[in-house]
């Protein structure tokens, strides 16, 4: 079990926005550490990124590892990941980029469209125009496939981002990141462990193109096609969860296994043996 003591380290002050508050976050050398805030975010980050290694995803993604963080007299679970920014690179959220170019809010602009497909196409076209990145619609679709499968309720316009190289003045897609609020990880507020699975499914809402995961996923795949397939098995899921036994109790791991099994059945067209 990896453990790090951060009693004398100040958390990084966040300047972005999240829909459910901020986790404590530190950068030590080239490694980021995030503490669980509402439940088992570290498990979600770790499990989702490890399972993405068994997929056909063509875009880079951040790989997370579990960690126990000692901070101000408490020991809490969380995750760590390498800093993916290279020299001269900046991470620019799409909300910020759109405001810089138009003076308007991207989230409000998207909400003005009546259909999810219109929102997705508009965003893809705008980002290709503003950044020169090609096939941005395919990138968005892969992101939405991951979010639908793993039930990511926190995919807003501030955590979809691009990279900007200040030396070459070129943009590139950001590695996919921020999967902490997947798999009903918020057990403090919306999805307590004793809440039935069907109620959790009814309660969760997607972002940013529709409140329904399948509505925005179907719209994106209709526009840009299916972008990835998963090749992990239920045995792989159980193995990954077993490796997290030192960090999260059995009740949480069993719940997550149940969720993944359910999603594998629902999205069978994304599964490949």
What are these regions (language model features)?
Residues 1-106:
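Conserved ATP-binding subdomain of kinase catalytic cores across diverse folds
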Residues 28, 33, 64, 81, ...:
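Generic structural hydrophobic/aromatic packing signal, biased to beta-strands
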Residues 36-37, 53, 167-273:
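C-terminal catalytic region of ATP-dependent kinase domains
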Residues 41, 45, 139, 153-156, ...:
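Active-site-proximal structural scaffolding
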Residues 56-59, 154, 270:
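Short helix-capping/linker segments at secondary-structure and domain boundaries
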Residues 62-71, 156-166, 273:
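Short alpha-helical "patches" and their helix-cap loops
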Residues 84-144, 248-254, 266-267:
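ATP-dependent phospho-/nucleotidyl transfer catalytic cores
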Residues 118-185:
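Conserved kinase catalytic-core segment
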